[in-house]
């Protein structure tokens, strides 16, 4: 089966936005106008094609990025819907990794929200060219031009409108296309499927000319030949303008900006045209860099059908009918279903049973996948998110993804013995799907602990346990993932000796324990010279310390950010063993920690609260009571914005408190920022509770 769509006519794009900017509705309309869905799915009534997990339908928020393929003007668009809630940033981050371009959707009233900034930063990190779609132009308070200035100020980007609105709020009729200099007006009877091209209304001619001039200048700046033409007073043709915008969009020096109302079916076709005209094909983005697993040297992987297969697994889902689906973006070469691939990250061979092309919840079997395509692989056993799949003759590892450590834990107790078995299977499946979710066992109580990026994240996981896996479980109080660290450097000697007839135990070490910068982790340095401790026992000392650091001396929390230097010691020809040195290492570490001025650390969350001015005082007072430190206060769209760092331990149940304090008018977002030291009076309480 030959390739149906040439590589230059493929667009892998994501739709990213803040909650409620209308992202899923926009995706739905794209599917409707490209002829995939027959009935428009509304998020308001929980039937959107893209939102296909039960909880998404119920909460009306998008959790997992579903991928769908659709066609527009003979171009194939692979659409990836990404979640907009802070607790799911990992999902967004994964999708960004495999996108070639993105549409950032902003609400014409809410403008640039904190979550939009996070998503924007992630798109910058992966160098994803993007365009902006200002949605909900029919809402009361809609203001396209204010969103334009917010994008400049808050995101430090350069938005260039390529169409501007005709009217706003209930008078929003259509857009003025600044490239063609025509008005496009949608008629409501045909659900927005038909539109008329008219002359620009007289009252908007001046505004249109002003923005047309800005557009011409921005397009001309991208290319020398265009600049000469523009400065020489020559008219730029439509092709010239499009060429300039595309160059600027690809190198991210400008962001094409459009407007519309997805819910009212206006502006979606012009958005699709812009996707095809300005966002990159897989061949137009920078080459992907990879690593040669044999010698760790850097390789570049170019997008083409020639060459050995290479692809990246970016999402895993469990499907009740097919089992595990692994979503893969192919970067190079082609692959047939039924063939073998190498998982170069794990060094294991995998067989691809079937290849499925996904429509957000329907699927079609395909024979082979080509470069630039995205599809689901069925039958992979060991592959997890972020692994590279490639031809075993030409191994390559595409970028590794880094996943954040969980900041919150809760205990889950299965209700019956049968639930116990189902739960362990379910949790391991969920952990495969979501690398920012961890499962562990509490050492003392034997309880199962689940950890994640926030309360909502874990709520949804518990919900999925009940619905998808039919596990009845009791959920404990949320526990904060505290850590311990040390503040002063100390030296410590420890001799572990048991010699009372027969084979004894003997291990003797001198270690130096030093604090390191926050977030730099653990480091072990071997400074033994002259063989005072034989080489084979040194890893045992390291292992002993690594085991001991899981339970700190203050309250049994993991110890982080320190350096150990092993610099002296002694051994016994007969009695020394790995075990003895492991015990000596762990005892030395514990003793050293007691003298090294150990402190407790807690996760500090970056909190942004948005409230009407009259509640400002109460909100700040409340954040101070929660041991928050206020960083800044701003105004946005007539509301006050408070930025603060607040300990996670003090933020439980905040949404309810904020709602009652502001009569439901305040909103907030929070994401993990860093670990900070716990004040001594609070630390004392925590330690007493732990020792209980």
Swiss-Prot record:
Chain residues that bind GTP: 17-24, 81-85, 135-138
Domain of life: Bacteria
An example Gene Ontology biological process: ribosome disassembly
GO MF terms held by the record: GTP binding; GTPase activity; translation elongation factor activity
GO cellular component: cytoplasm
Every tr-type G domain range: 8-283
Matches recorded under Pfam families: EFG_C, EFG_III, EFG_IV, GTP_EFTU, GTP_EFTU_D2
Subcellular location: Cytoplasm
InterPro entries for this protein: EFG_II (IPR041095), EFG_III (IPR009022), EFG_III/V (IPR035647), EFG_IV (IPR047872), EFG_V (IPR035649), EFG_V-like (IPR000640), EFTu-like_2 (IPR004161), G_TR_CS (IPR031157)
Keywords on record: Cytoplasm, Elongation factor, GTP-binding, Nucleotide-binding, Protein biosynthesis
Family to which the UniProt record says this protein belongs: Belongs to the TRAFAC class translation factor GTPase superfamily. Classic translation factor GTPase family. EF-G/EF-2 subfamily.
Protein name as it appears in the record: Elongation factor G
Organism: Helicobacter hepaticus (strain ATCC 51449 / 3B1)
